[in-house]
Amino acid sequence: MNRRDFNLGILKVSAAALLSPRLLARPLASPDSTPPSIAALYKNAIVIDSLCAPLVDMDTPPTADVLAAVRQSGITAINFTISDPTFEGTVGNIASVEALVEQNPDAFLIVRRHSDIARAKRENKLGILPSFQYTAFLEENPERIEMFRRFGVRIMQLTYNNRSIFGDGCLEPGNAGLSKAGIAAIKKMNDLGVAVDLSHSGYRTTSEGIAQSAKPVLISHSGCAAIYAHPRNKPDEILKSLADHGGYFGVYLMPYVVASPTVPTREHVLDHVMHAINVCGVDHVGIGSDGSIQKTVLNAEQKAAFGQDIARRKKLGIGAPGEDRCPYVPDLNGPDHMEVIAAELAKRGQPAAVIEKVLGANFQRVIGEIWGTG
C-alpha cells in the first residue's frame, strides 16, 4: 500500500470503505436540541470512539478549522486503524501517525498506556490508540506481534473478513474457527498486554477467541444480528459470552444496522445499542463508529471512485454484503456524533451513569484490564 492508499484508507476505516475516495471536512454542526444536562455530562465525560479516523489526509497538515472540529467534537480518544497488508506499509503508517502528533502536540497524543486516556481528557487533546485490522504482515512472522507492541500498537484484530492463519473471518462459509496459530497469537497478546479484537471474525472464531483469551476481548465495531442478520453483526450468544468474560462491544454507525434499501438513521443505531445493553449489561457496550471525526461528504468524482473500490473489494472476496450503500449513517455523520448519541440515550430513558459508560467509560475500563492501569 502506497502513501496515497493510506490516506484514502484513513478517511473511512469502515468495511465499506477501507480504501475509500477522499472525503471533505465540514464545520462542526451542533446536535439539535441537546438538553443542557446532557451537554454538561458530555463535556465532563471520557468519550471514546472504539474505531474512528482522525483526519482526511495524513500527508496534508491539518488546518486550524480541522483541528478546531477535532477539539469541539468532545472526543477524548479513538481506536485508529494503521495496519497495511504489508510490513513496510504498516511501518510507514506508524511513522505518519508519529509525525502527525509531533507536528501538532497541542492537538494529539498517542495513547501508549492506560493513564494516557485521562491525560488526553485533561489536556484537551485527541488520544490516538494505534490498532491493526489486517494481519497478513503478522502471518509472515507472528513474532512481529511483540515488535509492534513495542512500537505502541496495543490493539490487534485476528482476522479481517476472509481467512487468516489465525482463524476464519466473517465471510468465510466454512466458519472454521481459530487455528493453532490463532490460539498461540491470543496467548502472546495476553502476555504482552495487547487487546484482541474480533470485530471482523467469523462466529466460531469469535466465540473461540473469547473463550481462549485469559483477558477480556474487544468487538470494537459491529452490530447485533438479532436486530439485523448480516455477516458483520454478532448473535446474542456471542454478545452474552463476551460480557461474561468482561469484554467490550462497540456498536458501529454503518449501513449494516438495517436492511437495504432503508436508509440507516440514529434510531436504528440506538436500537442496536439498547439491544446490546439488554444482552450484555450496561458495563460492556460502547460506540465504535467505523467512520471519521470529520463529516463525510462525497462529490460525483468521489462517488465514482467509491464504486470502483467496492468492485475491487468484491473481486478480492473481502467485500461485505451491502457495501455499495451509503457508508455512514446520515444523521450521525459529523464531529458531533457521540454527543448526539448521548442525547438519544437520554431520550430512551438511560440515566447519566449509563450514558457515561456507553460514551467511553466501558472502553476505558476494559483497556485498563487488558493493558494494566499504569
Language-model features: where?
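Active-site core of metal-dependent hydrolases
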Residues: 167-261
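N-terminal hydrophobic targeting/anchoring segments and the immediately downstream early-domain regions
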Residues: 2-173, 229-239, 243-245, 250-374
